[in-house]
């Protein structure tokens, strides 16, 4: 199935049902009084994370989702039926952004997590609500309010412990094939990897971690060169980045300059991502003698001002790969995800009609009961007064 990590959709919650103006008419019961019921609330639109999904391709074709409208109230104090909700299932790791305001509504990071993205309209009030000691036959009602309408941007970001960085043909796909069951395409030309891929590295029966491979970066990626930097978002949730450097590029390019390009493009994309722990890994050492590879790696590290530990591996032959994976596993165990950060959610999203009923009833209560019919007009349609403010 084609990997799609972005989609725009329209969500529309259901409108609230209108209140009813009705009076009890029954034999032997004179002046039965008002019995108009309230309308039903409009249906909501929800997002739900599903671990069985891994792409947003479905929302490239189906772009509009509408919840059901609440039914109108009826006589005999019958309340209208609430509109049915709509649930949109998305892959775990999806970020939901309101395109109108630019705010992040939420990150779907756990299976089964639900997020309210459009709230249904409030129900209208029937005339029974407006009965008082001085107004025995109220002809007021309120209409239901419109449901929320939002244009949303869905961004799928892979959930991985380890992210891989490097120039095209640095050996990232070969590495992930060597350490996991993932089988990304491997070839001797640049940009073999066109979409991100995940691999699970199992160290033993109880220990494992997830590694993400993204397409390679080239100079000018921030300006759109190559495949650009849009895939870097898939590394935002990684705990450590493995920066793979081809120690002896076949095209004759300078490994030091290649490494600096990656660092530069990383900083252009996000300072937070650039600040993540990053390990230097020299790949393809099987192409050189051991002493020559060590000497060249040391020279590159010094040119980059790198003072931390670095690794020499050959993803093709497996040399040094196991030691690197165990060190990564140890780092992940010693640096667990902070629960507070993992569950971090944006500020409360405001919906249009949150305080509608409270405000309406407060305004009505403040009116002088003796003047309830001052604005009465015999020409009103069906003798009904509508109370509705938007």
Curated annotation (Swiss-Prot):
The keyword Hydrolase applies. It is found in: Cytoplasm. GO terms for molecular function: GTP binding; GTPase activity; magnesium ion binding. This is GTPase Obg. GTP binds at residues 166-173, 191-195, 213-216, 283-286, 314-316. Residues 160-333 form the OBG-type G domain. Belongs to the TRAFAC class OBG-HflX-like GTPase superfamily. OBG GTPase family. It comes from Escherichia coli O139:H28 (strain E24377A / ETEC). It is an enzyme of class 3 (hydrolase). The gene is obg. Keywords: Cytoplasm, GTP-binding, Hydrolase, Magnesium, Metal-binding, Nucleotide-binding. Pfam families: GTP1_OBG, MMR_HSR1.
């Amino acid at each position: 199935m084609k990997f799609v990590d972005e989609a725009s959709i329209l969500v529309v919650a259901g409108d609230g049902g209108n209140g009813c103006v009705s009076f009890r008419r029954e034999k032997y019961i004179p002046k039965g009084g008002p019995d108009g019921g309230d309308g039903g609330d409009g249906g909501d639109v929800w997002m739900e994370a599903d671990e069985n999904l891994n792409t947003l391709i479905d929302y490239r074709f189906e772009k509009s989702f509408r919840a059901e409208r609440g039914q109108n109230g009826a006589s005999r104090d019958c309340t209208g039926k609430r509109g049915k909700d709509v649930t949109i299932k998305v892959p775990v790791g999806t970020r939901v952004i309101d395109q109108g305001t630019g705010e992040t509504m939420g990150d779907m990071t756990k299976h089964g997590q639900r997020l309210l993205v459009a709230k249904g309209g409030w129900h209208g009030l029937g005339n029974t609500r407006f009965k008082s000691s001085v107004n025995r036959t109220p002809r007021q009602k309120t209409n239901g309010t419109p449901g929320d309408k939002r244009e949303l941007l869905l961004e799928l970001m892979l959930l991985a412990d380890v992210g891989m960085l490097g120039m095209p043909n640095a050996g990232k796909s070969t590495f992930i094939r060597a350490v996991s069951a993932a089988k990304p395409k491997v070839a001797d030309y640049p940009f073999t990897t066109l979409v991100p891929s995940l691999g699970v590295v199992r160290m033993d029966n109880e220990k494992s971690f997830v590694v993400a491979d993204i397409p390679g970066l080239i100079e000018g990626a921030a300006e759109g060169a190559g495949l650009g930097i849009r895939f870097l978002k898939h590394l935002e949730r990684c705990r450590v980045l493995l920066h793979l450097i081809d120690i002896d590029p076949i095209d004759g390019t300078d490994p030091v300059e290649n490494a600096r390009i990656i660092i530069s493009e990383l900083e252009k994309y996000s300072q937070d991502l650039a600040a993540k722990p990053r390990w230097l890994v020299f790949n393809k050492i099987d192409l050189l003698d051991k002493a020559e590879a060590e000497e060249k790696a040391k020279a590159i590290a010094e040119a980059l001002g790198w003072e931390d530990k670095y690794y020499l591996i050959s993803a093709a032959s497996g040399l040094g790969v196991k030691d690197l994976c165990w060190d990564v596993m140890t780092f992940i165990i010693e640096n667990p995800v902070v629960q507070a950060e993992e569950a971090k959610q944006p500020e409360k999203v405001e919906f249009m009609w949150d305080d509608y009923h409270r405000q309406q009833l407060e305004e009505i209560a403040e009116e002088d009961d003796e003047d309830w019919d001052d604005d009465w007009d015999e020409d009103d349609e069906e003798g009904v007064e509508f109370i509705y403010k938007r």
